Every structure is written in structure tokens, then in C-alpha cells.
Amino acid sequence: MAASKITLVLGSHAHVPYGADTCEFETMYADLLRPFISGLYKYPKIQAALHYSGVLLHWVERSHPELLMLIEDMVGRRQIEMLGGGFYEPMLPIIPLQDKIGQIELLTTYLRKQFGKRPQGCWVPAFAWEQGLVSPLAACGMGFTFLSDRQFALAGGDAGGYRAPCICEDQGKVITVFPVLQPLETAVGEKSVSPLLAALLEDFNKRSPEETEFIVSIFPRKINAGKNESMDYAWNRLFEDLSLCEHAETAVPGKLLKGLKGLPKLCFPDSSDTAESMSSRRFVIVHPEAGGIYSKMVFTNVLINQLRGDKSRKLSAHEELWKAQGSALFCMTGRQGLHNHLLRNAAYSALLGAERITREKSKFVPSLVPFDFNMDGAEEWLFQDARINCYAQSAGGGIFELDYLPKAWNYMDTCGGRNAFADRLLPPSYKIEDLVFGDIGGARNCRTEHYDMGDLDKVRRKLILLLRGSSVKTAPFGNIEIEKKYSLKKDTVFAEYVFANSGAAKELFTFAPEIDLALPGEGEAFTRFFACSAQADTPLAQPLFRGADGLKIHDLKNEVQITLTANRPFDGKIVPVSNGETGEELYQATCIMPIFSVSLEPGEKWGVEFALKFSH
């Protein structure tokens, strides 16, 4: 006996990352939330499952509370079922167990207070799955979740091409998984739903004539509106078509779950929503900016767990930490993900907010600690003061994190692993007008070399890094050795250089280090620059300056003044750094390049000292 109808789990999923611009929320509301909810409300017989992240629901509560009233009414008449999950749409596989449970319970509590019911099932962000997720999901009372039909195929589901719900198990805990038919989701947004479902049912009955039940789940995220057709009308057209469809009836998954018997048992491999997507664990390795956020998250978690006896403060710190765990930072690039500096800024602000909470109610003792912060098997060096964190590494001998804690801002939140005090030795004929950031042909680009630790003075909090002469005889300026000393005193980071010529011939070169700073944005609305001299501070209208004693940077958003000075006058160039991997130029940082002409006889030394001061 063939299936007479499709049992359709119609769903709606939406999320806007924490830290996104308000216009992103308004666009999501206008294109999906309002038309879907208001359209569904007109058709009481169409049931649906809704998953909207805690970030989005909280914004709706403040900006469009009338929408929550419609949802509450439909929950009350059992037309819709709210799905749980992590409040901040976290990348579940890579966050600690206590954070998985904490985020899920936070959204569960919100939904219960808002709509009067605990969710029975949940949404897995980006369908980022590892089998070990079953235990924490089940421990939080989640009886079911959803994964893509592609993931069902990877797990060895029904070879006929249509997947049935299944059981997943881990450490004695089980959860039911519903397949989401992604090709149908796309088709529904482009074509009339009734003939699509009719063709789907016919094909299913041909392939599986003995099956009497055919469950299909879809979460369409967009629908094509015709010419002069509003989004409200387009979604309403979908609901009208579905209400007249004879080939399907809708149901909520929680009710279906009670009647499902004899489900197959499957084990899903580590996977995500599309074949092109890499796992979140690989993502943080391939993209250093994601790896930096992940490392800071792990480090901050360690600090929080060291708190003893103050449960309220510990919970507050965890709730700040959770804001930085959004999946967009660990699975997507471009404006919707990692290359949106607003999202990274918000993540670091939350992490630093959590760190500040761990320091409350105690006298903070400044320190210099060797620690494998990046979890790469090599030690980094962490300077920590009351106002500034400054982290240095042997790779390139640069500073890779520079936190100004009073404003909860990481000024090294740059893109592509860019650092401060990344050293470059250029040919002496190199013109300042031609200077660009990054590697330069014919130069010694020291940021790709390994610096050895020469000395570590934890008491005086000083670190000396050494770069030997190049082992490659033909390398440019390979006879130049560099000693670099870092220290941190209150609001100022010091970097002292000594260059030595270990060769037998005179060396002429231009020293042009890169100091990358992640400022709030590009242009005078965000930042202003001034060249400093003994006479006056001169506003910079051009990216070039000459003979300056220092450079002042006014961060207008954070109301912070950053001053870069040197014990020698210097020329320099300022260049914005953008990322255009996805075809759209997105601001990431500002590269400051002071320039010095150096001439060294054999055995001769030359030095310069920088001071980078923060104030507000």
C-alpha cells in the first residue's frame, strides 16, 4: 500500500549574528519574519515549526513586539512549535560542553518565559554535526533535531534517495533526527508548491511502494517575488497554494515524534550543511582570524573556570563568553561571516567583557607569562596589565593580540594573521610612494621567519626576541641580525630594536615595519590621524608624512587616542587593509608603516625604540 499523502514538516529558520548592523535585522524581519508569521497566521490549519535564534528573538522583542504576540497566539492554538537550540546560534562542535548546555538552556528558558512551553526539539546551527552532540542535546531535554538529506546520504540512509527519520545514539543517550530536503526548499522558493509535492509523492511511491508514510521537512528561507509583488504577497501565495494542496498535510515534529516507531539507527559522520563547507575545526586552522577568536574563547573559558565561590559572577562571565561563539564566525567568510569586522569586534568585546568580570573584586597583578595560547605546540608570551593585554609570538616576532580593556577592544583584530611590528628590510632605493603592506619582492620579509627567545624577565616584564642571519646565502639582507625587546608599562607598549651587520660588507637598507591596527572603520567618521612634531600636531590629509616625531590616532568610536612615537624622526605611510575574497572589499584594519634609512658597516649596530600608548 503506497503513501496517500506527504506528511510535511514546514519550518522557518532565521538568525542574524550578534554584533551585526541593525539594517541586517530589519532586512531579515521584512523579507522573512514578518511575511512568514503574518501569512501563516491567516491559515490556522497549516502547522509549522519555527526556529529563530535568541539574538533575533531578543531584537524582535525590543523592535517589533507585535510579532511575538502573533507567535504566542499560534503556539497557544497549537499551530506552531518553537524549536530550541543555542541562544547565540553557536558552533556547537567546537565549544566546551558546559557552554553547549548553557546556551541551550538559555534559549529554552527564554522560549518558556515568552511562549509558555519548553521546546522538545532543537536546531543545529549550520547543520554542523558531530556524533558527540547527541549526549548534551539529550541532556537538555531535546528529543529531536534536523540534518540535511546530504548528511543522511553520508550516514548510509535509504538508498532509494528519500530519507526517513532515524535514531542517533551517543553514550547511551538517543535523539531522533529528521531529514531536511534541501532541493525541495530551493524549488519551493521558485515554483508553485502543489505540483512539486505531487511529483515528489508520485516518485516516492514508485521507489518505495510498500511504504505508507512519507515525512518531508523543509525550512524555506527565501521566496521569489514576482514583478511588483511584495514579499508579504509572495509568502501568502505559498500558504494559499499549500492550503489547497491535496498531496500533503502539515504537522509539527513534536507531535509526529510520539507516533514514530521502529526507526532505523544511523551514525552521522562529522559534517555540515553543504558539500563545499569545511568543518569548523578545519575552518579555525585555515583562517587565522577565526583561530584567534577560538583561542581567545578557550583561554577565557580557563579564566572563568578558575573563579571560585561566586556563582553569580561566574554565570555573568559565561553569558558574555557565549556571545562570541556564533557559528557565522566559524563557517562563513565575507560580509555574512568572518570578514565582517563588526562581527569580530563584537566577539572580542564579549570575550574581553568576560575577562574583565573575572578580574573584578580582586587586586590584579600585572604579569608576563609564557603560554601556548594558539594551541600550536609553541609558547607565546602574554603581557597582562590592568588596562592592556599584549600577546607576542615567535612567528614573525610580532604582536598578534593587543587588547585595550577599558573599551573592550582588540586592536589586533585584523584579517589574515596580520600583526603589529612585523619587520621588513627593503632595498635602499625603495620609494615611500610605492610602499605597500605585505610581502615585497627583493625585500627580507621577516614576518615569515622564526624569532628565538633571547631572554624572558618575568619580574621586569621584558621579552627579548632574536632573529639570526638568514641561512639562505642569497637571501636579501641575510647578514642582518635583529634583537627586539618588548615591554609593557601601564598604558604603553614598548618595542626596542637593535640591528647588527654580521657580514663582511656594508649593508644599506630601508627598515619599514608594519603596525596593523584594527580601527572601527575607514575614513574621518571613524578615525583621524595627526603627524606629531615639537611644534604642533598636523592633521593628515594624505597617507604620507615625513620627518615626524610621532603619529596620533583618534579612534572616534571608542574615544581612544593612540600615540605612536619613536626616538628618531621618521617618514611613514598609512594604508587601509581590505579583504576582497568574496568580490566585495571589506575594511579590516589600517596599516601604519614608519620608514627609516639604515647604513651598517660590518660589525656595526643601529637601534630604534617605539612606544605605542593608549589613553581615553
Question: Language model features by range: what are they?
Answer:
Residues 370-372, 447, 456-478, 492-494, ...:
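Beta-strand-rich recognition/accessory modules
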Residues 2-34, 41-43, 162-175, 181-183, ...:
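Active-site and substrate-binding clefts of carbohydrate-active enzymes
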Residues 5-96, 103, 120-124, 143-149, ...:
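Short, well-structured secondary-structure segments
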